[in-house]
């Protein structure tokens, strides 16, 4: 099913201008973090324009959103919790307060009640909430994640309580087919606080009850979980590879020593908080083709080394006049948020590869042979998602249509390589952008 987009309406007006300025500012900030070669002093991004040619979109599938889209961030925690969760628990506050005033231990209550919801009990939040939540996807900023398709560390939130059955990374297809992450009966809000709340109210365990399998006698000597996880991740971590490092450190809990230490001490590391799945949540996979006139204006200052090193700086103006793109886009709608990203070539093949292989036949609609098909696929992947970036440069005078300065070509190649890298690092899953609607 194909989609017609009113490109002018979507990219013009105050909202379109604000989005274009936000994209320009984001690309400019990324260039300020790039290590420049010796012959370039600085790179400035001046303008961004969506152009007039819309992309071609073909819907391939409707499915459940990827698991990573349900991770909560602290900025949006207040509105979601106050409106959704607290309203559901308001009728139980009276019963909760009466339970807190009961004797510290009751055998029947302890044996029959499951893990308690932290919203029922007035316990302070765990110190782990802040380190795990500060770096999770600020508004309108992409989040870098663990390389590979999806799963990553989000599986820790799904399977943490069954320590013997931790699953590794999954493909997007497996993540989508996984269904409700809380099908086993464990609620995310009850994972971190239930055991602690019950033990504080119940006091010491009588002798006639079985001894716990985990020795907690030496728990005070164990290092805290916060020491094994990144203590803070600034906003810049979401804009470079440092964000991926933080996710990898969280992922090390699957098979590393920190998990064993906290299991022995009786304190389980808390998984990232996950939003509740709702029936109205959905995700669309689209095959996106674009050969448009999107424009990006940059200036780079070239350093001249004659008659001495870095003798003078000469501004070079670069104009990206269009790009050619072919890939699979993911658009997920969850509550009042829209998550957007692209899939890498390998991940796209895992989801809709069979259809693209049929379409990759020759013009006579005959399927390609094995050698031709593999050569075509490798040729397509060699250029990445951005197959072509058209650029124009302006500096000084020209001779026979060529630039006088020999470093102009080097500057063009460097800038284009950085534009391609920024696109693939910030918009290709597991990185994604979130828009509030």
UniProtKB/Swiss-Prot annotation:
Composition skew (Acidic residues), residue ranges: 73-85
Name recorded for this polypeptide: Mitochondrial distribution and morphology protein 12
PANTHER family associated with the record: MITOCHONDRIAL DISTRIBUTION AND MORPHOLOGY PROTEIN 12
Domain remark from Swiss-Prot or TrEMBL: The SMP-LTD domain is a barrel-like domain that can bind various types of glycerophospholipids in its interior and mediate their transfer between two adjacent bilayers.
Function in brief: Component of the ERMES/MDM complex, which serves as a molecular tether to connect the endoplasmic reticulum (ER) and mitochondria. Components of this complex are involved in the control of mitochondrial shape and protein biogenesis, and function in nonvesicular lipid trafficking between the ER and mitochondria. Mdm12 is required for the interaction of the ER-resident membrane protein mmm1 and the outer mitochondrial membrane-resident beta-barrel protein mdm10.
Keyword Membrane: yes
InterPro entries, A to Z: Mdm12, MMM1_dom, SMP_LBD
Organism name: Aspergillus clavatus (strain ATCC 1007 / CBS 513.65 / DSM 816 / NCTC 3887 / NRRL 1 / QM 1276 / 107)
């Amino acid at each position: 099913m194909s989609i017609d987009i009113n490109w002018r309406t979507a990219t013009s007006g105050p909202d379109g201008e604000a989005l274009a300025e936000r994209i320009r500012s984001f690309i400019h900030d990324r260039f300020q973090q790039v290590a420049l070669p010796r012959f370039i002093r600085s790179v400035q991004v001046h303008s961004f324009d969506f152009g007039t040619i819309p992309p071609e979109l073909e819907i391939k599938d409707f499915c459940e959103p990827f698991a990573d889209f349900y991770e909560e961030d602290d900025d949006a925690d207040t509105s979601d919790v106050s409106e959704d969760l607290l309203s559901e628990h308001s009728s139980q506050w009276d019963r909760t307060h009466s339970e807190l005033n009961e004797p510290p231990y009751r055998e029947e209550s302890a044996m029959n009640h499951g893990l308690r919801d932290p919203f029922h009990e007035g316990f302070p939040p765990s110190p782990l909430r802040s380190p795990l939540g500060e770096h999770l996807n600020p508004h309108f900023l992409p989040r870098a994640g663990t390389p590979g398709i999806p799963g990553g560390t989000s599986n820790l939130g799904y399977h943490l309580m069954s320590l013997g059955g931790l699953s590794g990374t999954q493909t997007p297809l497996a993540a989508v087919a996984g269904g409700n992450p809380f099908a086993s009966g464990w609620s995310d809000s009850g994972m971190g606080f239930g055991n602690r709340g019950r033990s504080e109210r119940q006091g010491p365990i009588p002798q006639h009850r079985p001894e716990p399998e985990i020795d907690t006698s030496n728990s005070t000597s164990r290092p805290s979980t916060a020491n094994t996880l990144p203590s803070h991740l600034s906003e810049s971590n979401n804009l470079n590879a440092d964000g991926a490092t933080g996710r990898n450190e969280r992922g090390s809990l699957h098979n590393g020593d920190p998990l064993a230490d906290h299991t022995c001490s009786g304190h389980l590391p808390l998984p990232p908080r996950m939003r509740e799945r709702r029936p109205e949540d959905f995700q669309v996979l689209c095959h996106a083709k674009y050969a448009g006139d999107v424009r990006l204006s940059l200036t780079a200052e070239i350093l001249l080394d004659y008659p001495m090193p870095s003798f003078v700086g000469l501004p070079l103006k670069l104009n990206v006049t269009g790009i050619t793109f072919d890939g699979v886009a993911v658009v997920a709608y969850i509550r009042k948020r829209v998550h957007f990203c692209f899939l890498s070539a390998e991940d796209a093949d895992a989801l809709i590869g069979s259809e693209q292989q049929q379409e990759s036949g020759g013009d006579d609609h005959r399927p390609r042979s094995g050698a031709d098909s593999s050569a075509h696929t490798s040729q397509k992947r060699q250029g990445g998602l951005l197959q072509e970036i058209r650029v124009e440069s302006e500096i000084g005078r020209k001779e026979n249509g060529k630039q006088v300065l020999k470093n102009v070509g080097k500057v063009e190649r460097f800038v284009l390589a950085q534009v391609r890298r920024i696109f693939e690092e910030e918009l290709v899953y597991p990185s994604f952008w979130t828009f509030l609607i």
